[in-house]
Amino acid sequence: MNLNATILGQAIAFVLFVIFCMKYVWPPIMAAIEKRQQEIADGLSSAERAKKDLDLAQANATDQLKKAKAEAQVIIEQASKRKAQILDEAKAEAEQERNKIVAQAQAEIDAERKRAREELRKQVAMLAIAGAEKIIERSVDEAANSDIVDKLVAEL
């Protein structure tokens, strides 16, 4: 019986140990395990949210980059058009200035040519009068001389 009393005592001690463990040891261990499980679940959900946020940020960055490239292309095209417009305006202005200078030079040439012709006509008339004076050996008075020169200039 001794053996049976020992087994019974050990069984009672084991049951008391199990009750003690279930009442005082098991709840803190389970609380720590549940807390750790909750932290892991929170960490996983946080990581999942961070991944979604990262994907969204990358998509936004890609969209903004595309928009910036499109805007840059539009600005480049506008600058090219403006450059061509400025060049065309400068060419037109230079052409007008050239035409103006050429016309002014042509007018000056024509005026100089006309003045030279008039001067030449007067000199020819004077030479003709001088020749005529020598031929007739007399001098014509200044009024008559002036009339003759004017008539010769008009005829030439």
Curated annotation (Swiss-Prot):
The keyword Nucleus does not apply. It is found in: Cell inner membrane. Keywords: ATP synthesis, Cell inner membrane, Cell membrane, CF(0), Hydrogen ion transport, Ion transport, Membrane, Transmembrane, Transmembrane helix, Transport. Pfam families: ATP-synt_B (PF00430). Its main location: membrane. InterPro entries: ATP_synth_B-like_membr_sf, ATP_synth_b/b'su_bac/chlpt, ATP_synth_F0_bsu_bac, ATP_synthase_B_chain. One of its GO terms (cellular component) is plasma membrane. The keyword Transmembrane helix applies. The chain crosses the membrane at residues 11-31. It comes from the Bacteria. One of its GO terms (molecular function) is proton-transporting ATPase activity, rotational mechanism. It is a single-pass membrane protein. HAMAP family: ATP_synth_b_bprime. F(1)F(0) ATP synthase produces ATP from ADP in the presence of a proton or sodium gradient. F-type ATPases consist of two structural domains, F(1) containing the extramembraneous catalytic core and F(0) containing the membrane proton channel, linked together by a central stalk and a peripheral stalk. During catalysis, ATP synthesis in the catalytic domain of F(1) is coupled via a rotary mechanism of the central stalk subunits to proton translocation. F-type ATPases have 2 components, F(1) - the catalytic core - and F(0) - the membrane proton channel. F(1) has five subunits: alpha(3), beta(3), gamma(1), delta(1), epsilon(1). F(0) has three main subunits: a(1), b(2) and c(10-14). The alpha and beta chains form an alternating ring which encloses part of the gamma chain. F(1) is attached to F(0) by a central stalk formed by the gamma and epsilon chains, while a peripheral stalk is formed by the delta and b chains. Belongs to the ATPase B chain family. PANTHER family: ATP SYNTHASE SUBUNIT B (PTHR33445:SF1), ATP SYNTHASE SUBUNIT B', CHLOROPLASTIC (PTHR33445). This is ATP synthase subunit b. It comes from Yersinia pestis (strain Pestoides F).
